[in-house]
Amino acid sequence: MRRPSIYGLSPVALAVLALATLPPDALAQSRPYQPESVSASEYARAEQFLPWHAEKLTSGVTVSPRWVDANRFWYRNQVFGGHEFIMIDAAARTRRPAFDHDRLAAALSEASDESHEATDLPFDEFEFNASGGIRFWTDIDERWDCDIGAYRCTGPDSVARATHEIDSPDGSLAVFSRDENLWVRDTGTDEERQLSTDGEPHWGYGVAPEGCCQEISNRRTEFKPPPVAEWSPDGRRIATHRYDERDVEDLHLLEAATGRPILHSYRYALPGDSIVPTWQLHLFDAETGARVRADYDPVVGYFGGADTTWHAAQWSPASDRVWFSHHSRDFKSQTLVEVDATTGASRRVIVESGDTWVELNQLRTPYNWRVLDNGTEFIWFSEREGWGHLYLHDLATGEMKNRITQGSWLVVQLLAVDEVARQVYFTGVGRESGRDPYRHHLYRASLDGGGVTLLSPEDAHHAVSASPDGRYFVDTYSTRSTAPVTVVRDGSGRPVMTVEEGDISPLLEAGWEPPVRFSAKARDGVTDVYGYLWLPPNMEEGAVYPVIDYVYPGPQIGPIRTPGFTSGPRGQGHALAQLGFITFAIDAMGTPYRSKAFHESYYGNMRDNGIPDHIAALKALALRYPIDIERVGIFGHSGGGFSSTDAILTFPDFFKVAVSGAGNHDQRGYHFPWGEKYHGLLERNPDGTDSFDSQANQNIASNLKGKLLLHYGSLDDNVHPNMTLLVADALIEANKTFDMLVFPNRNHGYAREPYLIRRTWDYFIEHLMGAEPPVDYRIVQP
């Protein structure tokens, strides 16, 4: 087994680091790495490091716990050659297979008359049924029930997977939304009961909003998301919203089809619209259907994507009160509201306002507030002092009682509260001196203030989740160069058992190299910014290499996502390095996990995109690494499509090639909360201009000097194709040569399609490296 050398750097990386000792003129005299062609075999070598191949060379690197009760959870474990299901009992300190995989494969093979292997069972998740057996749906949506005592399987049947339901606390009922109304189903008898009757189109109960980000995708696949709802602890009541999109204007998409195309329309509000979605809290009695409407005016809607989890609501232990939070349209205030579940009487508990956006988590959700079970206090996340921290407040008055945490570091996620011991558990970044400031750690602090205790001492990135009762913490820790280790910790931080020790030896033996971690100064010459470089193997002495910048500007997340181990990071860093590129990714100013000032650095100026920090860092790195600063390319998807096009148009003498996908090139055409939160409310001027003109890529299309490939999916119901077409039209008007690729009938999620990956490689090989790519190389995704 080949292991990374000291400091997490490979031998190749250490050799390159030696170049840092060379004087700047030595690098300046280097020759460009520019082969005449890149062969199909080199593409094949790069292909083996794409995520779907690289992950098969690892084992035990990911643990996503599915809790069965307060002590037990199961997870799907990827192993070499397949996968397995493992059951953990944290209280008993035991780890065992969730069932006998060989016997289950045999029973399923006999019942289905198809061959099944123990390490390749045809499901990724399961649930325990009332008799202690398991129920699962196969990848072709067949439902099976298997007795894991006698190992007999029955099925398949045509009962659809209930993705659209949320079970009550005891599992006896399930709530769902149908035809704009709220329903419950008795899970024992399947009897259904309608709770509301006055729902109407675009004004329904519990419905997933049509606006951003996949309404048309859901319709076409017949996927039904769960309702936006929260059961009371006693299972008697359901809190939900009535979501109003009645007068919101439509967007339209055309599905390519033989003969006439198919028109798809959906409600989608844009910045500056006079009417945007709103919602109002409603409470239903699950037995009688009696409804209580909160005595509180409708608030601005902001639910997006497939995740309809209601992060903004919490019930009291006695099920007599419910709290919810909401923001103003401009996001400059957050409000916590208390509602009496019997009468609907409502009151504002706290209103926090600011000059820019106010958040309850730098990553948007889940929200970092919690009302304590004692009914007299609540925890509130705030960046009021420049960093995101937790504060204890009086529930009756809303007044702050004390700081729970403080200092020049960030609370990331509130995980659990032990009210008896008066302790709160959370993850944070940037607190440990001498460590990578982006590595998450687990902490404990007193609700009454006075100190913070580190519970995860290993100098690594810790991905942590809590058990339902907060007694145990599942902690997977790793670095970019070391395999993950997963442990269960108790409230003292002590590891009570080891769950997994990841194995990445086959990946290393295949030639995989960890990226090089770097820090550099941002545009201001003062602020530290951090990123990674992926270096080509077997670099030639005296050569400088073209560099590709993988960009996602945030503000809600950056391009790197995690400083922990990942075999296939976003941006194809390892694969592109195999082709002879140095690949670069950086969390520039405007991305999260730092101070509020860092995060909001380009508020009101979304064209910034952090690109000046990319340029400053690349210029500095070119003095230390064999980077050809005259050959810089950039690519990205979604916000990265916007920012990569912005980069080549705003800095045309620095960025020579850009590949830009599904870009929100003008926030006036994107979901209203996005631009209004990060750029400000749209203001129209008497001369016909507005406050969003400055961020629109089509307005600077005439600046293009380099090579630009635009691409989009024609059924993108997240980032509408209209924005890319506006850029294309402006480029044509400016008589600029560019390339464009359309993915018919794809939604926003086509970035990992093999054809796009190959075309991206070809484009950079031809126009940035100056070489000839192999003709029509085919990348195969298993």
Predicted features by range, described:
Residues 26-28, 745:
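Intrinsic low-complexity/disordered segments
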Residues 16, 20, 28-484, 488-489, ...:
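Beta-propeller folds
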Residues 249-250, 310-314, 319, 325-327, ...:
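Serine-hydrolase catalytic core recognition
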